[in-house]
């Protein structure tokens, strides 16, 4: 099957040897293997509190062929032991993610706390978020983590927001761009960590918890383009490798992209093709299509 994206361009930036590895690896994967690569499993220390799964790690890896792993916070020994075990069972090197938005404490118990997004912005010193990114990368990669599910590039327009009120880096696009860029510069200064910004299309405008109910960003297309859109466009042009979609709808923009979309059919970005395929990939050009 021909590639639909150009792996030499952003956000991949692969050389010929790396592209050959990708193609050779895909060639020996079965369809079941490839389906498994789409999923990231959340692991727990002391039992799975959500799914009731009682499979061993080896059984889970052999059955589902997952592409990535995320874990609930554990001790350094627990985290490193889990990652090493999972990697030993995987055909393809696993993507292992942690939420380090303020330092290494997001990767492991006892990790170094540097600064929250709000503290970084309040300092008015880009060196603070730079150090948060630097320490995050040092401590998470020491454990075997290779993907960082931060920073939050959201904009706080509602101080009652329960998710990003202290994790976001400001109340306007300029501050968010400045301080999240500094964080990402620190994150990648010494280590090869995959950058992942969130929560597309943007949290911080409302009070609901998008983890529990549908989040809604009610900005008009024009308002979004001048705020959240500016932030995402900046980071995409800078080469960010991954963007996490939130369980957040952007109804006025979605209906502009798809005029036939009824109110009752509006879905969050995690399920909305007009937001992921049209706005993020086509308009903002997250993925470089092969010419």
Go through the PLM ranges and name each one.
Residues 30, 69, 99, 125, ...:
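Conserved, mostly hydrophobic/aromatic
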Residues 44-47, 98-106, 146-156, 197-203, ...:
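Short glycine-enriched loops at secondary-structure junctions
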Residues 1-113:
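N-terminal hydrophobic targeting/anchoring segments and the immediately downstream early-domain regions
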Residues 47-63, 128-139, 223-232:
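Short, acidic/polar
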Residues 75-81, 122-138, 173-178, 222-225:
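Glycine-rich anion/phosphate-binding loops
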């Amino acid at each position: 099957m021909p590639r639909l994206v150009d792996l030499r361009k952003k956000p991949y930036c692969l050389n010929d040897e790396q592209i050959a590895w990708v193609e050779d690896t895909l060639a020996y994967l079965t369809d079941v293997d490839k389906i498994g690569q789409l999923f990231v499993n959340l692991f727990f220390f002391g039992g799975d509190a959500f799914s009731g799964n009682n499979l061993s790690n080896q059984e889970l890896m052999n059955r589902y062929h997952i592409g990535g792993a995320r874990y609930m916070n554990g001790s350094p020994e627990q985290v490193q032991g889990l990652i090493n075990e999972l990697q030993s069972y995987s055909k393809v090197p696993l993507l292992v993610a942690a939420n380090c938005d303020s330092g290494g404490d997001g990767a492991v118990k006892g990790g170094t706390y540097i600064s929250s997004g709000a503290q970084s912005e309040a300092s008015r010193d880009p060196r603070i978020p730079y150090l948060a990114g630097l320490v995050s990368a040092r401590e998470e990669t020491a454990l075997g983590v290779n993907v960082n599910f931060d920073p939050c590039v959201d904009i706080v327009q509602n101080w009652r927001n329960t998710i990003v009120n202290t994790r976001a880096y400001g109340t306007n696009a300029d501050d968010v761009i400045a301080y999240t860029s500094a964080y990402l510069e620190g994150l990648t200064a010494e280590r090869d960590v995959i950058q992942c910004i969130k929560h597309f299309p943007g949290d911080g405008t409302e009070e609901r918890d998008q983890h529990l109910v549908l989040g809604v960003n009610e900005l008009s297309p024009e308002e979004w383009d001048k705020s959240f859109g500016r932030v995402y466009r900046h980071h995409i042009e800078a080469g960010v490798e991954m963007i996490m979609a939130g369980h957040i709808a952007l109804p006025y923009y979605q209906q502009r992209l798809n005029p036939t979309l009824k109110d009752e059919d509006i879905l969050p970005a995690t399920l909305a093709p007009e937001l992921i395929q049209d706005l993020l990939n086509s308009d903002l050009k997250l993925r470089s299509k092969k010419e």
